[in-house]
């Protein structure tokens, strides 16, 4: 059965940062645009970077790859540290054009770096859900009105008109984060985190870009890719 539907947020750092501010995140870390994958464009991004959100289209080619990847991991296994905070996605549109779940993944896996304001709604949600399963976290978010109301307010603050809540969105956001020396792809539509190998605080952005390029190479005719990085302000 399909879960609740939330309006998608715009892939816009200004909207994202305002949304997180309203949830009680201190602005010592801010999302910024990743204007391109070339080294000269990456060099203008403030460092350090602690997470990247990648926007990409859900296409037939991607769905074929996703199924093959899942089957391969289930048969061969992978190492995933228990330190990773991961949640499933049951809210439709929550990752369309930029997702609350992607933002939660980015912040939850960097609690040692970010700061929260007193009474932060997001901090409260993370503390209350820390011992839950990925499925339980998803259900808890569905009924977490303080985040839902803030989400809907932010969805109307973008530069483009928010789509109808019933409009199908074929764009999806994932979070790419560094946890315990490894780069993880966190996608609530997948059954588990994806371990993309070793990384570090210093090399995270460059390692993430390698993963992003693979997404683009799988759909060379698609132009609907975008990325924003959570970097030190």
UniProtKB/Swiss-Prot annotation:
InterPro entries given in the database record: Papain-like_cys_pep_sf, Peptidase_C12_UCH, Peptidase_C12_UCH_sf
All residue ranges annotated as the UCH catalytic domain in the record: 5-232
Site (Transition state stabilizer): 89
Entry-linked CDD domains: Peptidase_C12_UCH_L1_L3
Site (described: Important for enzyme activity): 187
Tissue expression per record: Expressed in various tissues at low level.
The protein's name in its UniProt record: Ubiquitin carboxyl-terminal hydrolase isozyme L4
Organism: Mus musculus (Mouse)
Name of the encoding gene: Uchl4
